[in-house]
Amino acid sequence: MAEKMLVMTSNDGKNIEVPRDVAERSLLIKNMLEDLGDPTEPIPIPNVSENVLSKVLEWCAHHRNDPPSSADDDDSRRKTTDIEEWDQKFMQVDQEMLFEIILAANYLDIKPLLDIGCKTVANMIKGKSPEEIRKTFNIQNDFTPEEEDQIRRENEWAEDR
């Protein structure tokens, strides 16, 4: 039996055909299909462009046979910033695409992909000074030296010793 296919339409009007089980890695899509049955029309994905949706669906296809995560998995996954090798390579994209993937994973309710995106960002920050973080993310420092000193004093407890 041939696998069931769905058509998803990105916010830039491009149709992407995808196996149903791949699309159902998104809880948003899975719940929608459970409520509505088999769609005869393309499923609009209004918040995601074609290139980002294609990238997200590539991740979903690679992870299509992963078991659903349990609450226990969530706890242990939250405590580590380790990322599997395939996922690390998958996340080697420019910053704009990385943030678009994170936003799409959040919108489409794909928690494992959202976790990997956030861990990738956490690893970009880990061990860096505020100045290095600003440089990495092109953030303008709008604090006066006095405000910076006050923030450092208030957050002394959080510094590595």
From Swiss-Prot:
GO terms for biological process: exit from mitosis; G1/S transition of mitotic cell cycle; G2/M transition of mitotic cell cycle; kinetochore assembly; mitotic cell cycle; mitotic nuclear membrane biogenesis; negative regulation of cytoplasmic translation; negative regulation of mitotic metaphase/anaphase transition. Keywords: Ubl conjugation pathway. One of its GO terms (cellular component) is CBF3 complex. It comes from the Eukaryota. The keyword Transmembrane does not apply. InterPro entries: SKP1, SKP1-like, SKP1-like_dim_sf, SKP1/BTB/POZ_sf, Skp1_comp_dimer, Skp1_comp_POZ. Residues 102-161 are annotated as: Interaction with the F-box domain of F-box proteins. The keyword rRNA processing does not apply. Pathway: Protein modification; protein ubiquitination. One of its GO terms (molecular function) is ubiquitin protein ligase activity. Component of the SCF (SKP1-CUL1-F-box protein) E3 ubiquitin ligase complexes. Essential component of the SCF (SKP1-CUL1-F-box protein) E3 ubiquitin ligase complexes, which mediate the ubiquitination and subsequent proteasomal degradation of target proteins. Controls sulfur metabolite repression, probably by mediating the inactivation or degradation of the metR transcription factor. This is E3 ubiquitin ligase complex SCF subunit sconC. The lineage of its organism: Eukaryota, Fungi, Dikarya, Ascomycota, Pezizomycotina.
